[in-house]
């Protein structure tokens, strides 16, 4: 709920000033005059009360001490309890994810990985949010290399083979032979075909019709007839700059 707006304290109004003094009488008709002060009193002997035995005859269901278990504002606490219970139910609705490793990866686990797993356990929330990266030391890497390749005594190294040079490598190759000998390269160097042009939306204006108004361009026969007769001035058919 939004917080309540703070009410501004009203400015204290000045006290009213009366020209006449108030009368010594009841100020309102509903009020009664003050009773005279009691002067003659009686003294009654008092008896001490034992609070432990005074409620011994009361039934337990009417015990007043049970009210202390309930808070003063029950409605507000009930709402807060309902909100907390709803939050708890929504948070515990989805269980935490658990990761299972396959048997093949578990069988080929190295001592370094096992040592990192046996370390101080962290909460599941942190583990699920981070990627699982094994921490390997240099010693564990050596053990891993010895463990993964136990049957091979030596590493196979390919022989140093040099490709023979072509006899005409130093001589220049003519352009015709180069195109015939390398057809695959010519395919890569060829320019891509341009896409086909789409439909023409608006045709270009001919150069002789530049500066002429559109109305006379559409009526070229009438325009030519009126120009021959001299009934059209330049300001009537030319576009103003």
Swiss-Prot record:
Transmembrane segments: none annotated. Residues 100-110, 181-193 have a biased composition (Polar residues). One of its GO terms (biological process) is cellular response to ionizing radiation. A motif (D-box) lies at residues 129-136. A motif (RAD1-binding motif) lies at residues 56-62. Pfam families: RHINO. The keyword DNA damage applies. Residues 1-10, 72-87 have a biased composition (Basic residues). Involved in microhomology-mediated end-joining (MMEJ) DNA repair by promoting recruitment of polymerase theta (POLQ) to DNA damage sites during mitosis. MMEJ is an alternative non-homologous end-joining (NHEJ) machinery that takes place during mitosis to repair double-strand breaks in DNA that originate in S-phase. Accumulates in M-phase; following phosphorylation by PLK1, interacts with POLQ, enabling its recruitment to double-strand breaks for subsequent repair. This is RAD9, HUS1, RAD1-interacting nuclear orphan protein 1. It comes from Bos taurus (Bovine). The lineage of its organism: Eukaryota, Metazoa, Chordata, Craniata, Vertebrata.
